[in-house]
């Protein structure tokens, strides 16, 4: 880890920095910010587990930034955003206030909460982005990140909702709610597993079980409550320990990442995969790694949906260029490009009705891949995200009571 951090710190010294600090940028016009950003480099730290997402960023986004703004985008792949949050915190504690390693991070949830608590985010500027007008900030699912108000500290990039994938040729009648899934696991030993938390997707599956054990999300909304957690978590650990002997490899080990789960599904070792981003299912079929008979669905008792964002750290030396990147990502054209089935299939974080007519027409022409459950179908049974303190407690409790 120390070696990797040293490499990242070296990377930061090679980037050209903006000359204006954050407060000076807030007093500029957008034209002045673009001029300040010209010739800059943005080190964007983001999850790197999807070749299609990586290609969209490295080819389409980076290509447009270079051609239109002379900005170099350096995509830095990571597996866990928490490590980068800790890096930024370490820099702050070391007094590195204007020459940080990270210019932009793909983030949400408990990692955003940590950035807020540590005063690690650059805030109060998002209204300067011209394409901020495309965002519906009246939507609480966008204005709040896992229950934490965004308050001008991050910019939405995608909206997602959890879904399950199965091979319809092998599992034509999948379990449609959590109770049925638990029964199915017991009746089909070795055919199900989930990534071990704190893997992002594994943690999400765990929260679905937690919500099921609570009898629904109503008691879990709002700030963390220890008494409620104690009651619901006891039921959750009992359920998970009850099904553990029926999991893949009898629960002796868990996939470390969703990528490993996807490989197990591709190899036919397990009957299900799942993801916050169902578009990944269609891309896996198109790539030939998953069967053509892959189909996906949400649970009738609901699946969790959320928004993910990009954030500029307080000590980024390239804030103007990072703001230009965020504005491009919000544009109707860039949101349309990533929504295309053959590119990514990601759901937009903007109001399509606010975009240009040709962009609206482009969205209307998109045909959802047959392996991807339509977002409108998932939205009929959407569950809210829990606030970040719940996530931390659930993950810690799983490690102590199930994964030990």
Where are these regions (language model features)?
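Extracytoplasmic/periplasmic substrate-binding proteins
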Residues: 208, 248-315
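Loop/turn elements at helix/coil->beta-strand transitions in domains of secreted/extracellular proteins
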Residues: 39-43, 69-72, 99-103, 188-192, ...
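Paired acidic/hydrophobic, glycine-rich loop segments that form the ligand-binding mouth/hinge
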Residues: 96-106, 124, 271-276, 282
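Extracytoplasmic ligand-binding site segments that recognize negatively charged/polar headgroups
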Residues: 47-60, 75-85, 102-259
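Conserved C-terminal helix/tail region of periplasmic/extracytoplasmic solute-binding proteins
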Residues: 18-30, 263, 369-404
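Gram-negative bacterial Sec-dependent N-terminal signal peptides
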Residues: 1-17
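Early extracytoplasmic/lumenal segment of secretory-pathway proteins
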Residues: 22-110
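Mature extracytoplasmic/periplasmic domains
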Residues: 303, 308-377
């Amino acid at each position: 880890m120390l070696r990797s951090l040293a490499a990242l710190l070296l990377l930061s010294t090679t980037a050209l920095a903006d000359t204006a600090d954050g407060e000076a940028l807030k007093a500029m016009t957008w034209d002045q910010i673009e001029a300040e950003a010209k010739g800059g480099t943005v080190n964007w730290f983001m999850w790197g587990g999807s070749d299609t997402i990586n290609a969209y960023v490295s080819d389409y986004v980076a290509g447009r930034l270079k051609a239109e703004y002379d900005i170099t985008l350096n995509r830095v792949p990571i597996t866990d955003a928490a490590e980068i949050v800790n890096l930024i915190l370490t820099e702050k504690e070391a007094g590195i206030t204007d020459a940080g390693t990270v210019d932009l991070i793909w983030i949400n949830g408990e990692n955003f909460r940590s950035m807020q608590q540590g005063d690690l985010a650059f805030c109060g500027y998002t209204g300067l982005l011209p394409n901020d007008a495309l965002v519906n900030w009246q939507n609480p699912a966008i204005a709040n990140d896992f229950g934490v108000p965004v308050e001008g500290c991050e910019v939405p990039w995608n909206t997602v909702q959890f879904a399950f994938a199965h091979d319809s040729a092998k599992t034509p009648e999948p379990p449609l709610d959590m109770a049925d899934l638990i029964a199915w696991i017991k009746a089909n030993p070795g055919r199900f597993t989930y990534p071990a938390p704190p893997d992002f997707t594994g943690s999400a599956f765990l929260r679905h079980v937690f919500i099921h054990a609570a009898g629904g999300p109503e008691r879990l909304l709002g700030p963390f409550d220890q008494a409620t957690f104690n009651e619901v978590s006891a039921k959750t650990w009992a359920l998970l320990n009850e099904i553990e002997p029926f999991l893949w490899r009898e629960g002796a080990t868990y996939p470390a990442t969703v990528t490993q789960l996807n490989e197990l599904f591709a190899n036919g070792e397990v009957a299900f995969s799942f993801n916050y981003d169902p578009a990944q299912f269609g891309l896996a079929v198109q790539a030939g790694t998953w069967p053509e008979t892959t189909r996906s669905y949400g649970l009738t008792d609901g699946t969790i949906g959320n928004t993910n964002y990009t954030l500029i750290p307080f000590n980024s030396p390239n804030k103007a260029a990072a703001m230009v990147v965020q504005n491009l990502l919000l544009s109707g054209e860039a949101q349309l490009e990533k929504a295309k089935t053959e590119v990514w299939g990601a759901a937009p974080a903007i109001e399509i009705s606010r975009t240009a007519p040709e962009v609206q027409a482009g969205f209307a022409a998109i045909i959802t891949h047959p392996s991807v459950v339509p977002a409108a179908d998932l939205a009929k049974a959407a569950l809210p995200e829990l606030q970040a303190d719940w996530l931390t407690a659930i993950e810690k409790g799983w490690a102590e009571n199930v994964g030990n």
